[in-house]
Amino acid sequence: IARSISLQLGIPAYIYDGVTVDELLPINKLTGLPSMRRKGMGHNLNTRAAALRYARESGRDYKDITVIVAHLGGGISVNLHHNGKIEDFISDEEGPFSPERAGGLPMFDVIKECFSGRYDYKGMMKLVKNQGGLMAHLGTTDSRAVEQMIQSGDAHAKLVYDAMILNIAKNIAKCAPNVCGKVDAILLTGGIAYSQYVTSEIEKRVSCLAPVVVYPGEDEMRSLALGGLRVLRGQETAKIFHKSESANG
């Protein structure tokens, strides 16, 4: 898409903080199986925009801050920004469950479910990506509807919602050991960050690590524009990627 627009208008096109941007430190990519590696794929655009905003508002350069950013939306991810890079990333496939995603699950139970005969590959992917989390427990992906259930006295809804919030807090804390706990701030962004119930409960659990700052919502088009502007102004350098021989076939 970027190339076609570039050719039509005769101008350069930049792809900024795509989902597949991966800046994880080598130590954070390792797992218990050499054939499987952790990836820094997820809400990079929105989380870096939040980190850049915090740097700007605190009068510091992005490369000089250390922040943990939690993106709270249909999927929930948490990452660590340090030395101007996203050095650790907990994706929505391994972290807390969310309105739609199942999040991290007990491995042996997942293996059993895969071989139960109830799901093929596509069915299993749909289950964990679109039918998990709040949808699986409460039949809705709308956090506002869940909060209305809680206000109406639904104890089960409160248990599920509070479990999601607790797991968000746990995953925020998991990023801190990367920098020996020396974190400047914890940033909460995404659509669910509009919820005072959610943000106040998270703050109560993680403010012992660092101050919590809330930047609700997503402003991805503006973030893309500002990213391109920083390159044009020379504040950032565009990276050139070449297709490897293996990618050609």
Give the positions of each predicted feature.
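Glycine-rich phosphate-binding loops at beta-strand->alpha-helix junctions
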Residues: 183-203
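Short, hydrophobic alpha-helical segments
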Residues: 54, 58, 176, 229-236
